[in-house]
């Protein structure tokens, strides 16, 4: 099959832990061909289909120079057997617009994974609300007092931004509450943004659950 991955720049990948890289490696091992593009490479024009400026790539197996890329070319998304949207957060306006272009490509016959509407309706952090049986005590709020009460109840907590990924912007606050106020102000931008707060679970060192 011909697969198109919509990703961040390949040069930014940390291949020792990147899920998209693992998917590419397994796809190539199974004999599928790979192409990549960035979300900003998506194009639509009246009277035409959604296209993208794509590069065909081959994984080399080398840990440093891990891919070889062909020159950019224009291709309709319907020319691929599957299009995989793998752009990392944040879920900003450009990400939102990209999902609409991908939804148009679906109407034209492209097979897009995950479904663009699902990406809009299920932000990565908040999707866990649909699976409460798999999560520990969790709070989503922008109110510092809510966070203080949650800390008083659970003592050892984790605070994280809703639009982060890869461990960025995550803080742990222990029973002493050291810097809880300043961390809250940093993450919620003085009350302008909601944050997620969770009880710290030592079992996290044994792994987590992924819902696919």
Pin down the residues of each PLM region.
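Extreme N-terminal starter segment of soluble prokaryotic enzymes
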Residues: 1-4
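Conserved N-proximal alpha/beta basic substrate-recognition cap immediately N-terminal to
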Residues: 11-140, 146
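Extended hydrophobic/aromatic-rich secondary-structure runs
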Residues: 13, 26-33, 152, 158, ...
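Phosphate-binding site of ATP-dependent enzymes
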Residues: 20, 145, 152-156, 163-212
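N-terminal cationic-hydrophobic initiation segments that often serve targeting/anchoring roles
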Residues: 28, 106, 151, 187-188
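Short acidic, glycine-rich loop/turn motifs
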Residues: 61, 161-163
